[in-house]
Amino acid sequence: MIIENKQKRKDKKMKVLGVSGSPIYNSNTDRALKLALEATGLETEFIKLVEYNINPCRACIGCVETNRCINTQDDGILLAEKAKEADAMIIACYTPYSTIDSLTKAFIERLYPLRHKHGFMAGKPGGAIVTCAIPARNTALPPAGDMGVNAIMFYMMEEGMNFVGAVKILGNVPCIKCGYGNECKTSGIKMIFGNEATVQSVGVNKFEEQLDALDAARELGRRIAGALKAKT
């Protein structure tokens, strides 16, 4: 029986789920996640949360008996099932107001039904990709990138997952493209880069131009694959 079970695990095609909370299509976050998924060399699925209807968890605990949300009939149930069926998961987000975005937060909370009695996410390899507009050298502002990584990492740790690593990307403050970034008195450009900064002087940060982030995304994918291989 043990030999048969091992053979079944060996024959099973591994699948890695990648979930992006970025609402912008083809964003830095999306492209980094897709690169990490590609680097696994395994079957993958890319989920764009903005394309789904996800309500927040209502903390009713009605999911205890069935491991399934009973309080809101939305896409959160489908997404939780995808996470349950996947062998590994990478969560990618951006960090408005120095924390993970609302779509990613709602997604994580809606995975709560998978916890009860069975721990369906336990043991699965997982990773994080976080985009932050605040450069690491700016110590006057909150370390939003680190805070985003921690939010995802702590979720995975609390569910008993095997957190294998994180990727941090330097993103772009929305004020760069709103049309008023240079003159708005609450401009994020001024807050982050100083009063003399302009849309033109700050420019646009692209994932592909950040070599450390590129390497880290590929390495994350390889680590996910390695952790899955070690389980077989």
Where are these regions (language model features)?
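N-terminal beta1-alpha1-beta2 submodule of the flavodoxin-like/Rossmannoid cofactor-binding fold
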Residues: 2-120, 172-176, 187-232
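Short, glycine-/small-residue-rich phosphate/pyrophosphate-handling segment
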Residues: 120-170
